Amino acid sequence: MVESVICAGTVSRVSSVLQRDVKQFGKQFLFDHRDETCWNSDQGSCQWIVLEFTQKVSVSEIHIQFQGGFSSRNCILEGCLKNEELKTVTEFYPEDINALQICIRRAVC
């Protein structure tokens, strides 16, 4: 069984929040496991999410869900150790659907 690498100590940052309305669309909704909430980025290309983990992690799957009609055409998973430069680990191409998608099956960061 796959275990989430997101824990209480995981620090997250996002590129933007829709209309800067963090109470309704902020990053706190990224991993809250509630269907009625979500992080919503503002307009523009190149939206991103940065996660800082308390220890080294190995990513085997990414579970991602978009609002239908607003998915990214291409996603890039990057990784690095603290104070190093980000490197591309893999790219993946989610479908433009409103369903939970499992995008990669094995990546070593």
Question: Residue locations for each model-derived region?
Answer:
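Disordered, acidic Ser/Thr/Pro-rich linker "stalks" and the adjacent N-terminal cap
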Residues: 1-52
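Intrinsic disorder/low-complexity segments enriched in polar/small residues
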Residues: 4, 20, 29, 37, ...
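Sequence-pattern detector for short linear motifs
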Residues: 16, 76, 108-109
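Aromatic, loop-rich ligand-recognition surfaces of beta-strand-rich domains
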Residues: 33-88
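Beta-sandwich interaction modules
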Residues: 46, 51-54, 89-109
